């Protein structure tokens, strides 16, 4: 069972829930104060504006007792995935290295993007090496940065690219270091991503009927 943790200000929990059900993954939405890590094989921290994004995006949620429990789950090898604001929570809590800074042009960005799978050894991307997928982003603080370039190169999972998989500054929507859209820990069980797979999981609501989000989410089935 995968727990979708809802903090005050989380807004995407229902979309993630419906997408996981569509992907055949057993899941439940859990309020952060009610979270019991012993009941779940993994967690997803969905998008939104946890605790109003006061101080910094994700910083207050990162300091909760709930995230201490999530950290222990990660250390135990269980799945921890952060989407958008969830990714911000993961870096603020130290589960992933780096920071998510305001977009380079200081504007909220909402658009569909192409992504190249760089690491095919994570829970979500096994067997997808160099595959090009398409999902939407929607954020104001999604510019990934880390002061360790070697870490960035070895831990990035997805990079922003064009439809042919070419990676350049021209297709970097927010100024992220090395066009990074997603990173994971060395073990591949803790993954943070700015794109929203849940918004690319239904033909009716996806651009051109794209359901590439399901390609990633279905891989959670063997763990749930």
From Swiss-Prot:
It is found in: Cytoplasm. One of its GO terms (molecular function) is ATP binding. One of its GO terms (biological process) is 'de novo' IMP biosynthetic process. Pathway: Purine metabolism; IMP biosynthesis via de novo pathway; 5-amino-1-(5-phospho-D-ribosyl)imidazole from N(2)-formyl-N(1)-(5-phospho-D-ribosyl)glycinamide: step 1/2. Keywords: ATP-binding, Cytoplasm, Glutamine amidotransferase, Hydrolase, Ligase, Nucleotide-binding, Purine biosynthesis. The active site is at 84 (nucleophile), 196, 198. Its main location: cytoplasm. It catalyses: N(2)-formyl-N(1)-(5-phospho-beta-D-ribosyl)glycinamide + L-glutamine + ATP + H2O = 2-formamido-N(1)-(5-O-phospho-beta-D-ribosyl)acetamidine + L-glutamate + ADP + phosphate + H(+); L-glutamine + H2O = L-glutamate + NH4(+). It comes from Saccharolobus solfataricus (strain ATCC 35092 / DSM 1617 / JCM 11322 / P2). NCBIfam families: FGAM_synth_I, PRK03619.1. Residues 1-224 form the Glutamine amidotransferase type-1 domain. Its EC number is 6.3.5.3, 3.5.1.2. GO terms for cellular component: cytoplasm. This is Phosphoribosylformylglycinamidine synthase subunit PurQ. The keyword Cytoplasm applies. Part of the phosphoribosylformylglycinamidine synthase complex involved in the purines biosynthetic pathway. Catalyzes the ATP-dependent conversion of formylglycinamide ribonucleotide (FGAR) and glutamine to yield formylglycinamidine ribonucleotide (FGAM) and glutamate. The FGAM synthase complex is composed of three subunits. PurQ produces an ammonia molecule by converting glutamine to glutamate. PurL transfers the ammonia molecule to FGAR to form FGAM in an ATP-dependent manner. Part of the FGAM synthase complex composed of 1 PurL, 1 PurQ and 2 PurS subunits. PANTHER family: PHOSPHORIBOSYLFORMYLGLYCINAMIDINE SYNTHASE SUBUNIT PURQ (PTHR47552:SF1). Gene3D superfamilies: 3.40.50.880. Pfam families: GATase_5. InterPro entries: Class_I_gatase-like, PRibForGlyAmidine_synth_PurQ. The gene is purQ.
């Amino acid at each position: 069972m995968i727990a979708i943790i809802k903090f005050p200000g989380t807004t995407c929990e229902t979309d993630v829930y419906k997408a996981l059900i569509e992907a055949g993954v057993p899941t439940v939405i859990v309020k952060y104060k009610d979270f019991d890590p012993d009941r779940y094989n993994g967690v997803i921290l969905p998008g939104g504006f946890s605790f109003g994004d006061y101080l910094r995006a994700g910083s207050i949620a990162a300091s909760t007792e709930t995230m201490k429990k999530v950290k222990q789950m990660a250390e135990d090898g269980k799945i921890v995935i952060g989407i958008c604001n969830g990714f911000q929570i993961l870096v603020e809590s130290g589960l992933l290295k780096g920071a998510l800074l305001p977009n380079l042009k200081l504007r909220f960005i909402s658009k569909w993007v192409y992504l190249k799978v760089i690491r095919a050894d994570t829970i979500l991307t096994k067997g997808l090496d160099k595959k090009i997928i398409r999902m939407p982003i929607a954020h104001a603080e999604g510019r990934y940065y880390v002061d360790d370039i070697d870490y960035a190169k070895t831990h990035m999972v997805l990079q922003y690219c064009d439809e042919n998989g070419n990676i350049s500054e021209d297709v970097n929507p927010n100024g992220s270091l090395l066009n990074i859209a997603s990173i994971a820990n060395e073990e591949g069980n803790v993954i943070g991503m700015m794109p929203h797979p849940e918004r690319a999981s239904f033909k009716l609501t996806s651009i051109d009927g794209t359901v590439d989000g399901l390609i990633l989410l279905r891989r959670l089935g063997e763990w749930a």
